């Protein structure tokens, strides 16, 4: 094997100092940030900060004290002090200029990590990565056995967090879809209907229900815990008259209802379904039955390139998605997904992409 000198490596524009910074310094900051966010969500810290400011118009900074959090959330002061100290070092919070005992959120942290109603919120996405840790032992065993991991058998709070990872992508997709199909969306909001397949805990339904206030929505799923959470969400928002949540498979629903929908949504669901091509082909036959003749099937999926394909921009989350669900999911890339659609009754498929936001619109 050819011996590669340090100078030759440096000649490629990367020094050993660069790599130390990347792996040891930046890596540790990133790792600690994920730990802080995950623990902050589990301990209720971010929820408390959200509730504290949600009634304030245009709030973008939250101020608080260590003692306040300890008292309100019944947390040990020593552990909380250590968490806050690391959060200060990682840039989540800052010390207030006027009072050194008061902390405040760093710029844009409120929008990114606390206010889950904000379009830029990524707390759910980053918080979900925290849950890779408890799944590591299962993943390590599966490296040897090749067994699939049943995500629904993980603790319900972990499953909920993993599904919330899709909340941000769902919001971005809705925003881009509404911008790209203005005429269709105007009619959808007047008297239209939406079916979400694999509605889970209702995060995506919440996004569309708030934007399309006159649209009827049906959500279906086979996970009983997700169904209960989605129904609770509907009740809390007084949406019972126009939104129904049903515990049914797509095949069962397609063959027991006469209703047709203007928009059918599959948001980060297809990859988790049975990987067998015949099963998925039947799924799309059922979706074809449920869609109006002029309707749109919207599929939001991570498009994962081949491992040895040339590197593409905006693929970190897609490839991380593949890694976190390896063995229990089957993904497509743009070429293989288009080939799959060509094998179904649908005749038109368009890939919509803007930056890192992407989805497919499929028609009869």
Model feature map: region roles:
Residues 26-31, 39-40, 90-189:
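Conserved Class I S-adenosyl-L-methionine-dependent methyltransferase catalytic core
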Residues 201-213:
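Conserved SAM-binding loop of SAM-dependent methyltransferases across substrates and taxa
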Residues 223-225:
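Conserved SAM/SAH-binding beta-strand->alpha-helix loop
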Residues 251, 255-264:
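A short acidic, Gly/Pro-enriched loop at the edge of an enzyme's catalytic core
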